[in-house]
A protein has these predicted regions:
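Short hydrophobic beta-strand element within catalytic cores of glycosyltransferases
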Residues: 179-183
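A short, well-ordered alpha-helix in the C-terminal region of glycosyltransferases
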Residues: 209, 216, 223-237, 249
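Nucleotide-activated donor-binding/catalytic signature segment of Leloir-type glycosyltransferases, i.e.
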Residues: 128-144
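Aromatic "clamp/platform" in nucleotide-sugar-dependent glycosyltransferases that forms part
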Residues: 162
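Conserved acidic donor-binding segment of nucleotide-sugar-dependent glycosyltransferases
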Residues: 184, 194-196, 200-207, 216-221
Length: 253
């Protein structure tokens, strides 16, 4: 028998039309199409002009690290908001996060909070210039670093991406109890974030709601502790053992 052919697709919503035929051909020639999220089935069918969905299955990315933050360390978290990202404005839109942060810094109720950015990329100089132009005083660029200590020490995590597949940093923030607040731009986010329990999804472009959501958490230490615990527990859905087991079941089917 012919070996099964598995295609592991990463979601890109602005795919060139010339690839649409490739989607259809790939579907016809493969035994299974593996998507990062079941929510991408409709997108794939739309790209490929397909009606049959029987070959689809979904397997998410596993968490990046073996360790999960112990609950006893949650009270030690600092008043820090974290961004871990490649500095690529087209996709990541960190400029939007900095605009939101301006609202945070000008709110007298939120004195003492800081924003740390871990990462690097071609847009870094633009972001540093934006920090200067907005006169932001509590923003630091940490460069290319192992992010674990930042996740452990930070209370909140921001993501303002235009598109993602299944973002590893979102998994990572959860496993270290760093509560994510995310612009709702990708269907897969709804499989990762349980609204109001382990994080928040905010309507894309609603800068004020993003700011108010952050403010509510910043002012409520008790709720942050509860949500941090739920974030850690929810990330265990994506342990390496569980994801490997899904792949093994698929390959042995």
């Amino acid at each position: 028998a012919l070996a099964k052919i598995l295609i592991y697709l990463v979601y890109k919503p602005y795919m060139d039309k010339r690839f649409h035929r490739l989607y259809k051909t790939t579907y016809e020639q493969c035994d299974k199409i593996i998507l990062l999220s079941s929510s991408y089935k409709e997108d794939y069918c739309r790209f490929g002009g397909l009606t049959d969905k029987s070959k689809f299955t979904s397997i998410p990315n596993a968490v990046s690290f073996d360790d999960f933050l112990d609950f006893q360390y949650i009270p030690r978290k600092q008043n820090t908001v974290l961004i871990v990202s490649r500095f690529d404005e087209v996709q990541k839109r960190i400029s939007l996060a900095l605009q939101i942060w301006k609202l945070i810094e000008t709110d007298k109720d939120l004195f003492g909070w800081e924003l740390k950015l871990v990462g690097f990329g071609e847009s870094e100089s633009d972001y540093k210039e934006q920090v200067k132009s907005l006169n932001l005083k509590h923003v630091s660029f940490e460069g290319k670093q192992n992010p674990v200590k930042y996740y452990k020490n930070s209370s909140l995590f921001m993501m303002t991406s235009l598109f993602e597949g299944w973002p590893m940093t979102l998994n990572e923030s959860l496993q270290f109890g760093c509560i994510p607040i995310v612009y709702d731009t990708c269907a897969s986010f709804h499989e990762i974030i349980i609204q109001g329990e382990n994080g928040y999804l905010v309507t894309d472009g609603d800068e004020r709601m993003f700011y108010l959501t952050m403010k509510k958490l910043m002012l409520d230490t008790g709720n942050r502790k509860i949500m941090s615990q739920k974030a850690i527990e929810s990330s265990k859905r994506f342990t390496l053992d569980k994801i490997v087991n899904q792949w093994e079941n698929l390959l042995n089917d």
